[in-house]
Amino acid sequence: MAEGGQAQQQPPQLGPGAAARGMKRESEVELPVPGAGADGPEPGLSKRPRTEEAADEGMQGNQEPTTTPDAMVQPFTTIPFPPPPQNGIPTEYGVPHTQDYAGQTSEHNLTLYGSSQPHGEQSSNSPSNQNGSLTQTEGGAQTDGQQSQTQSSENSESKSTPKRLHVSNIPFRFRDPDLRQMFGQFGKILDVEIIFNERGSKGFGFVTFENSADADRAREKLHGTVVEGRKIEVNNATARVMTNKKMVTPYANGWKLSPVVGAVYGPELYAASSFQADVSLGNEAAVPLSGRGGINTYIPLISLPLVPGFPYPTAATTAAAFRGAHLRGRGRTVYGAVRAVPPTAIPAYPGVVYQDGFYGADLYGGYAAYRYAQPATATAATAAAAAAAAYSDGYGRVYTADPYHALAPAASYGVGAVASLYRGGYSRFAPY
């Protein structure tokens, strides 16, 4: 009975804190401790060293002052017992303490207040989170590096591309080396071009730099500067779109010239259409007339008198060969072939009119010798027309052989007189 009494009185020796908690959970206090024998003192003796060891470990790992080990001891529960490092603290108390001390786990190793499972999760999650953040950071750095490399390559490509500048209002005596010398101080120049016409420089040109950055710097420095009293302007040259469109003729005969204008320039060709259908104005602009033997002959609406003695078959064949050619240069061979044969004068017309389609206007201009020296008889008119045809060189009259060329001022300011002044080497539009 004495031993039984000692066994019943043994549990209150666990400590003051454990006695209070044991009164709330009497069934838990009377449960046998695993690993203990039939003797009563062994459960209390087995619980005391483990609690003290856990308190010692907590004091070593914790830098802050903690409570006494007896106050931290928790009684055992009926659930399966936790592993030994937890020292009897149930898992239901571990979760709130883990939340309270989650931010201090990296600084303090409080193994007493938290279970190993939350710490394991935190330790396993934190490296993965750190690795994920590092991976994201590295990926972002790689992306930023790629973008910066792309931007730098684009900038280098844009700077390395050649650029063309338009320079206007430059002095008229400037030539390509002068322009190259003026712009060469800013960078390498690929090409320099000054635009000229038949009277000299037009006062503007183009400079092509190898590097667009050099071109921009030259444009900023030289734009608005005064060179030899002229304020030059430097701007970016705009690309001119060169369209190679085929010229569509609006006329039925295939010529690039209006029939009215063509009849003025070469009346013989259009008069020959009554004999050759190839150079007719077409059915739209001609009146069909039934000729002898049922042959339809197209008479043009522009009715011109036929010139006797004119070689119509030859002229018509030549004109048909050159149909569609531009009259700006190449088409003159048509009229040159027509004028090769000295035409006969038309008695019904005044003597000043002769069959030279291009240069008939010169006679109205200012040459009194032609106006009064032309006799009214047909024989003299024929000789004068032949002389006038031989006098022409096919493009412009050689005015240097004219006896009235040296007169100053000219007799009158007709077309031929003013043209002779320009062809004689004098031009009031010459820059210097």
From Swiss-Prot:
A molecular-function term among this protein's GO annotations: DNA-binding transcription factor binding
CDD domains: RRM_FOX1_like
One Pfam family named in its UniProt record: RRM_1
The organism's place on the tree of life at top rank: Eukaryota
GO cellular component, one term: cytoplasm
Subcellular location field: Nucleus; Cytoplasm
InterPro entries recorded: Fox-1_C_dom (IPR025670), FOX1_RRM (IPR034237), Nucleotide-bd_a/b_plait_sf (IPR012677), RBD_domain_sf (IPR035979), RBFOX1-3 (IPR017325), RBFOX1-like (IPR047131), RRM_dom (IPR000504)
Protein's job: RNA-binding protein that regulates alternative splicing events by binding to 5'-UGCAUGU-3' elements. Prevents binding of U2AF2 to the 3'-splice site. Regulates alternative splicing of tissue-specific exons and of differentially spliced exons during erythropoiesis. Seems to act as a coregulatory factor of ER-alpha. Together with RNA binding proteins RBPMS and MBNL1/2, activates vascular smooth muscle cells alternative splicing events.
Official protein name in the record: RNA binding protein fox-1 homolog 2
Organism: Rattus norvegicus
Top-level taxonomy: Eukaryota, Metazoa, Chordata, Craniata, Vertebrata
